[in-house]
Amino acid sequence: MSAVRIGPYTLQNGLILAPMAGVTDQPFRQLCKRLGAGLVVSEMVTSDMSLWNTRKSRMRMIHEGDPEPRSVQIAGGDAQMLADAARANVELGAQIIDINMGCPAKKVCNKAAGSALLKDEQLVAEILQAVVGAVDVPVTLKIRTGWDRDNKNGLTVAKIAEQAGITALAVHGRTRADLYTGEAEYDTIAAIKQAVSMTVFANGDIDSAEKARRVLHATGADGLLIGRAAQGRPWIFREIEHFLRTGEVLPAPELVEVERILLEHLAALHAFYGDVMGVRIARKHVGWYLATLPGAKEFRAQFNRLDETQAQVATVREFFAGRDKSLGTGDGEGVAA
């Protein structure tokens, strides 16, 4: 995969970690960047600055130590509030502003934000023009193919975005009504790529190196946005990059490497959030890492009862030590994709 440009920034590849609330915090962004992502995007930050004093919001706006270019996603339904939020995030260190018009969650859509905005093309235009006009950094946009299957206006929204000065567009191959059910479709993304000259990223169900190549061929997209498939599997970026570059499938990481990556991730979560919050947030990540391994369900029940950082680390080490004994060491056992 060739390098991809977003404004003045040249990415090492077109593989992007999609913004996911409660997932793509700074420790996970740093990890995915080390393991091959060309760009990592922050968790969604509300455009309502009156809510920025919560600890959750403050943690989401820590950009010091983030891999560059620092991309921050904002969400909301008011053009002026989004413009103000974009400006404030740039002052805090954001180098790219990403606008969320793709989240299908009810708590977002019920506030006329996320993919709910696709219903109102005039408002879309107003928001994009306001944000692009408010900052001197590239502004990118994430959308879905439409509101529902009878209202697939992704192509129209893409043209509005290009006219407003959006630098790059990511398109999830489902409508808002689809949520995450069924299979993503890529025909709409292909039509959008044909119709606009800005950078286009395809998103949806990209869970393997082979699928990544098929989606690129089907859409003609410049790159790929990868979200849920990276949960517990941050090495998916290097797997895809290697396959696209060489045509060879990288073997799954051996257990010793999975243990090392997981322990590094645990340590980063504990350091970033502190003992109490770090322990709580680590639980879901550990569950994702171990989901495909025998005994994971029982281990997760045990792990989720732990409330100290040292206990979490020790228990993870014990889990992998037990695996080594049951499987033998050096047998090339890896974690399935």
Named regions from a protein language model:
Residues 1-3, 7, 11, 15-16, ...:
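Alpha/beta catalytic cores of nucleotide-metabolism and tRNA/nucleoside-modifying enzymes
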Residues 20, 45-47, 75-77, 102-104, ...:
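Active-site beta-loop-alpha junctions enriched in small/polar residues
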